[in-house]
Amino acid sequence: MEFNRNGIRFEYPENWTIEEDSSPDGIFSITASAPDGAFWSLSRQPAEVDFEQLTDFTTKQLRGEYPDLEAYPASDDIFGSSLSRADFNFSYLDLTNTAEVRCLATTNAGYVFFCQAEDRDWSHLHHVFRAMTTSFIRGTIGKGPSSD
């Protein structure tokens, strides 16, 4: 399936659901949820957003909900776009979970990606999350093989 609204375009699995949210301060968010509860979320922020502050806030929020939270610096490179911030591991209802937050700065906006899944599903879903992020960069930012 393809999401293509409000200047944001990406592909997502057919059996996932989409929720959109916007705020008066210009922040637009989309969450794609899998039937099993895993999700990938994208938030478009103003270009001058402080990613370090956003990541610190996310870490504090997660730590408040999951006291055993472990956070690690992390980064990815997709089509020459550097996405950095953090990986998280935590327990919830006797299940271990993994989450990632990645940030991408452009001249027009800042983008924050957040994805989360139970560890038993992470090895499969991590590739789905990355494909969704890659399709966003290719479709919205215009980088990648299809834009040559």
Enumerate the language-model features and the residues they cover:
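Short secondary-structure junctions
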Residues: 2, 15-22, 63-78, 138-139
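Loop/helix-junction capping segments adjacent to catalytic residues or to phosphate/diphosphate-binding pockets
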Residues: 51-52, 94, 119-123
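Surface-exposed amphipathic alpha-helical segments
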Residues: 16, 113-148
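Signature of long, low-cysteine stretches enriched in small and polar/charged residues
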Residues: 57-108, 145-148
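Secretory pathway targeting signatures of secreted, lumenal, and periplasmic proteins
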Residues: 2-56, 60
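Short, charge- and proline-biased low-complexity linear segments
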Residues: 25-40, 106, 135, 139-140, ...
